[in-house]
Amino acid sequence: MSAKDVRFSGDARDRMLRGVDILANAVKVTLGPKGRNVVIEKSFGAPRITKDGVTVAKEIELDDRFENMGAQMVREVASKTNDTAGDGTTTATVLAQAIVREGAKAVAAGMNPMDLKRGIDIAAAAVVKDIGKRAKPVASSAEVAQVGTISSNGDTAIGKMIAQAMQKVGNEGVITVEENKSLETDVDIVEGMRFDRGYLSPYFVTNAEKMTAELDGAYILLHEKKLSGLQAILPLLEAVVKSGKPLLIVAEDIEGEALATLVVNRLRGGLKVAAVKAPGFGDRRKAMLEDIAILTGGQLISDDLGIKLENVTVDMLGRAKKVVIDKENTTIVNGAGKKKDIEARVGQIKAQIEETTSDYDREKLQERLAKLAGGVAVIRVGGATEIEVKEKKDRVEDALNATRAAVQEGIVPGGGTALLRAKKAVGRIANDNPDVQAGINIVLKALEAPIRQIAENAGVEGSIVVGKVLENKTETFGFDAQKEEYVDMVAKGIIDPAKVVRTALQDAASVAGLLVTTEAMVAELPKEEPAPAMPGGGGMGGMGF
């Protein structure tokens, strides 16, 4: 076991505070509409330019191990806020720095750290309650666009695009962000259910120009196992041919002979057919096939249900108004499933999302939910250079997370106004213990930090802005840093999701409380590298030995 370096009390807190300041100072310059960019060196390729707080925080590692511990604890604030709310990481970092700074001063003045933490927690709970009271539900698509615009640093085009996507796919729908090959940024809405499996043979193509197989009013056969021969389903195929409708076969795999027979029938024109592999793997594949069965009003042909392939009749098949299959994806539009059954399935998936502890499982369940409940929208981000595209993609992802948070818990006045107004709620708290009261006062002062930083990044004196906003008793009155004027924030569309503001404060108070109560720090001593050995002499030439 290697030797350790141990620091105590004031020495430990001072070095930790230096680390907190280095990280927070790098992150907080990005806050607000006039926040600056941070350029990050990459080990390969061009440097990355970003205004995303958590991206900056994740890149910072300090040489001094004690300073680095302080920095990493604040980085944890940004990461936690990002995981929970998807935005507000810079606000959380600014709040954490403000609470830690004041807390360290109070401890140095001889106050009890545990009582200080108790006070910080009491005040944080009061702010959370106050934000919950102030939050107003998102009533219109215009408000969704406003939230998106604010979170993407005033880019109205991004705000409108996200609002358009959310309107189309609903709040449960999946919206993904991809890089575009062109200069344009656009939205592609996929209606119906899409899964990432394409046709098994190009001979199934019906539209040679687009290289897609399009089946109108199709029957859909869903089979859990491999199809190695068609003997068992010949009566079914004959019934489908008589109906004159096309058929989509979805199975684990369709092997050589069966596939060749389908292709020959397709080319001869007797049977309009296409075949694709089932999406997913293992248990997830079965669940996705059941989703498709419920969406199309069909039945999954599975041994578990005791249904043999030879006993399948036409009324067991799913139906859809249209199926479009390309080389990589299959899209089922307007399935004939009963609304009641689909809603029950959606409820079941939501319950699984609540219960799961795995982030990966949660993500996959949410994708399934979206495909059943809403649809899928893809925002393709374009730009002149790769650096620009990456920077814009960061902002689009932030804006998307913020709008989702706004839909969940409502909106509050933006620009740090909601936190500043929460001072009134914290100011009402009185505690007999002076150290607990000092903890409450630390949060009271820290609530000014975000609006001060937004103002200072815009080149305006923060104290003057705080004073003017507090002078006016209108709850929604605040400072528009973009135009450097005092306005009604909600009327101007400068709004923040309540969830983002709440999470930022909770996470900042939680980690800052731990930092304040730190009394000792333990780090590994840096290892001394041994000096490299002398290279071999190898004799001197020309000496004649």
From Swiss-Prot:
Sorted alphabetically, the keyword list is: ATP-binding, Chaperone, Cytoplasm, Isomerase, Nucleotide-binding
- Gene Ontology cellular component terms for the protein in this record: cytoplasm
PROSITE patterns assigned: CHAPERONINS_CPN60
Checking Pfam families in the record gives:
Cpn60_TCP1
Taking the record's annotation, the residue ranges forming a coiled coil are none
Tell me the residue numbers annotated for binding ATP: T30, L31, G32, P33, K51, D87, G88, T89, T90, T91, G415, D496
Keyword Ubl conjugation, does the record have it?
Answer: no
User: GO:BP terms for this protein?
Assistant: protein refolding
* EC number(s) stated in the UniProt entry for this protein: 5.6.1.7
Q: What class of enzyme is it?
A: isomerase
Q: Where in the cell?
A: Cytoplasm
Q: Which InterPro entries match?
A: Chaperonin_Cpn60_CS, Cpn60/GroEL, Cpn60/GroEL/TCP-1, GroEL-like_apical_dom_sf, GROEL-like_equatorial_sf, TCP-1-like_intermed_sf
Provide the catalytic activity annotation.
Answer: ATP + H2O + a folded polypeptide = ADP + phosphate + an unfolded polypeptide
- Top-level taxon of the source organism: Bacteria
Q: Name one GO molecular function term.
A: unfolded protein binding
Q: Subunit comment for this entry?
A: Forms a cylinder of 14 subunits composed of two heptameric rings stacked back-to-back. Interacts with the co-chaperonin GroES.
Q: What does this protein do?
A: Together with its co-chaperonin GroES, plays an essential role in assisting protein folding. The GroEL-GroES system forms a nano-cage that allows encapsulation of the non-native substrate proteins and provides a physical environment optimized to promote and accelerate protein folding.
Regarding protein family, the annotation reads: Belongs to the chaperonin (HSP60) family.
What NCBIfam families does the database record attribute to this sequence?
GroEL, PRK00013.1, PRK12849.1, PRK12850.1, PRK12851.1
Q: What is the recorded name of this protein?
A: Chaperonin GroEL 3
